[in-house]
Structure formats: C-alpha cells, structure tokens
C-alpha cells in the first residue's frame, strides 16, 4: 500500500499519470479481481466497514468515532478492527490508550481507542474474533474495504467533498486503490464530507449505481480559544488542507502552515523549528488530534511544548439527523438476515 500520495494525483491527469498508465492497468486488474472475486470470512457479529476509494485522508477516523458513539447510544459494545498503519505491531494487539505509544500502534488506532476497544492485526478476522471474546457485539472495520479479509454487512465509503478521487486514476497513476467501477459494485453507500465540487464525479457514479448518498460535515472544537487568534498550523495527516480549512472555519487566522508526511514521526528539529518560527512571529501553535497523540507519546518532547499546543478536534455531524441510525439499522438487519438464512 502506498503511504504517501504524490501531489499530481490530485490534479487533472498529466504526462506523469499517462506514463504510469500501463502499471496502473496491471495494479487495477489485480486489485479489482481480488475485490470482486474474494469471499471474505464471516464472523457472527454485525460488521460495518468504513472505507474510502483512495489513498489519503478522507475522514474515516471521525466517521468511525461517530458510529462508535452511535452504537454505544443503543446499548451496544462496539469494537474497532484496524491494521494499524504507522505502527510497529505485526501481530494481534489490543490498544491501551493509557500506555501504548503512536510509534508502536499508530496514531489513528490510539485516537480511536479513546472511544472504543481497538484490536490491531493484519488478519482482520482474527482481530474481530478477539474483540468478540472481549465482549464486543458490534464491529467497525476501520479501512479494509479493498482487503477482503473480513466480510462486512455494510460498506460505507467516505469521500472528501473538496478533494474527491483526485485524477480518477489507479495507483501508481492516481490515488484509486482499485478501478472505481469495481469498487462501486461492492459499495453499499457513500458519505460525502464537507463542501466543494471535487467529489461531483464520484457522486454521479454513485447515483447511477443506485447507491444511497449521505452528507456530513466536520465540526471543529477545541479546549483552547481558536477564534481571533493568529496561528502556525501544522499537520502530518493525509489531507492537511482539510485541517487548515477547519481552523479557519473555527475563526482562527492562519499566518503560517507546515505540512508533514502522513503519520509523520516528529523529530527534535521539527519541534525546535516550529517553536522558533511561532515565537518569532508571535503565533500560537495548533495541530490535529492525530498529531497530538503522536507528540504526546514521543520521548523527549518538552513538556512546555505540549502544554502550549492547541489541538483542533473534529466531530462528524450528518446533515440528516436520522442518517447514522438508519445506517446502523441496516447493518444490524443485514446481519440478522445473514445468520438466519
């Protein structure tokens, strides 16, 4: 899996995408066949897959958190299955948010573990069974749509409204993990997050395929006042522009930005440079919740840096009040039909 998306993937197709077309065709043929022909193993629990069509950030983490909260509100005990991108564990591991570090389990699982039990394992079936043994009765699969490692009763694909699916090409010519037509055949519904027309093409394709389309937005929040203050905003996530837009939406004035690779492991020089730049210009430092969990578990990060750091959290809010419950109802109904048939 490609961990860092080249910038040209998000622009109109150019000579680079064209030159990589043969490799993209081969990659797409293999990925598409695996997606369509595989028969994923099943578990005797309802499973919701939260995935996306492309490499890069789309909003899966806040979506998984929202469904975890929704399941808990029903009296369920949700568990989240993840591969743990950005971490060092290769076997089965249940994330302990009080003791694990992002270096070993990854930033997203550590953030998710604040909201539900999280099991990491390349074998998602094994992870789901372990969560079942721990008492979980509803599984949320964080990513894994293309892997076919665990059967999902419902697959919700997340797309960023501004970014969409980039140039619409398959890896390595573009960000798609498999041909869109193949992915659409396995998609149960689409969730468009935010504002913008970048996802218009995939929205049209989803509508033509007869799949339901849901709309949501990310509502920013922070324990630190954001509005009216001047910031140096930094992030090491898949789509930092979405974070910068959220800071502006919260009323913050962004004077400087600093973007790092996705899942970036911050070094002492990074922290020193950020601190010096902010001090020279009289700016506050603000980052994402994912970056904060990495920084908080790093060895050698000055305590003063963390206490002065503002963190912008985002909560997923559906445009329709009944949307989340409708999806949960569908997952559970499909599961009941599956186990009784």
From Swiss-Prot:
Gene Ontology biological-process annotations: lipid A biosynthetic process; lipopolysaccharide core region biosynthetic process
HAMAP family with a match to the protein in the record: LpxK
Pathway the protein acts in: Glycolipid biosynthesis; lipid IV(A) biosynthesis; lipid IV(A) from (3R)-3-hydroxytetradecanoyl-[acyl-carrier-protein] and UDP-N-acetyl-alpha-D-glucosamine: step 6/6
Residues binding ATP: 54-61
Organism name: Brucella anthropi (strain ATCC 49188 / DSM 6882 / CCUG 24695 / JCM 21032 / LMG 3331 / NBRC 15819 / NCTC 12168 / Alc 37) (Ochrobactrum anthropi)
Superkingdom of this protein's organism: Bacteria
EC number: 2.7.1.130
Protein name: Tetraacyldisaccharide 4'-kinase
Reaction(s) this enzyme catalyzes, per UniProt: a lipid A disaccharide + ATP = a lipid IVA + ADP + H(+)
Keywords from the UniProt entry: ATP-binding, Kinase, Lipid A biosynthesis, Lipid biosynthesis, Lipid metabolism, Nucleotide-binding, Transferase
GO cellular component: plasma membrane
Record-linked SUPFAM superfamilies: P-loop containing nucleoside triphosphate hydrolases
NCBIfam families with a match to the protein in the record: lpxK
Molecular functions (GO terms): ATP binding; tetraacyldisaccharide 4'-kinase activity
First-level EC class: transferase
Function, as annotated: Transfers the gamma-phosphate of ATP to the 4'-position of a tetraacyldisaccharide 1-phosphate intermediate (termed DS-1-P) to form tetraacyldisaccharide 1,4'-bis-phosphate (lipid IVA).
InterPro entries named in the record: LpxK, P-loop_NTPase
Family membership: Belongs to the LpxK family.
């Amino acid at each position: 899996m490609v961990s860092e998306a080249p910038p040209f993937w998000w622009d109109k197709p150019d000579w680079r995408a064209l030159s990589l077309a043969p490799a993209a065709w081969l990659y797409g043929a293999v990925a598409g066949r695996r997606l369509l022909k595989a028969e994923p193993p099943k578990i005797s629990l309802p499973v919701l897959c939260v995935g996306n069509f492309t490499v890069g950030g789309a909003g899966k983490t806040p979506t998984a958190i929202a469904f975890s909260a929704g399941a808990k509100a029903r009296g369920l005990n949700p568990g989240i299955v993840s591969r743990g991108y950005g971490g060092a564990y290769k076997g089965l591991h249940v994330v302990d948010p009080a003791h694990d570090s992002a270096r070993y389990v990854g930033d997203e699982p550590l953030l998710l573990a604040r909201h539900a039990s999280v099991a990491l394992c390349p074998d998602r079936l094994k992870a789901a069974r372990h969560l079942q043994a721990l008492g979980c009765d509803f599984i949320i699969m964080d990513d894994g749509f293309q892997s076919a490692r665990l059967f999902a009763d419902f697959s919700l694909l997340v797309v960023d409204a501004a970014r969409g699916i980039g140039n619409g090409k398959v890896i390595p010519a573009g960000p798609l993990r498999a041909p869109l037509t193949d992915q659409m055949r396995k998609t149960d519904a689409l969730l468009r997050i935010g504002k913008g027309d970048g996802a218009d093409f995939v929205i049209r394709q989803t509508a033509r395929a007869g799949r339901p389309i849901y709309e949501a937005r990310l509502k920013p929040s922070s324990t630190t006042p954001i509005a009216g203050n001047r910031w140096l905003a930094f992030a090491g996530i898949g789509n930092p522009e979405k974070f910068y837009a959220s800071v502006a939406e919260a009323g913050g004035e962004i004077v400087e930005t600093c973007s790092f690779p996705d899942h970036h492991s911050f070094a002492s020089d990074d922290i020193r440079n950020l601190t010096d730049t902010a001090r020279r210009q009289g700016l506050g430092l603000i980052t994402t919740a994912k970056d904060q969990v990495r920084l908080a578990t790093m060895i050698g990060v000055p305590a003063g840096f963390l206490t002065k750091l503002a963190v912008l959290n985002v909560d997923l809010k559906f445009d329709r009040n009944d949307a989340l419950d409708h999806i949960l109802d569908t997952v559970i109904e499909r599961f009941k039909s599956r186990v009784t048939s």
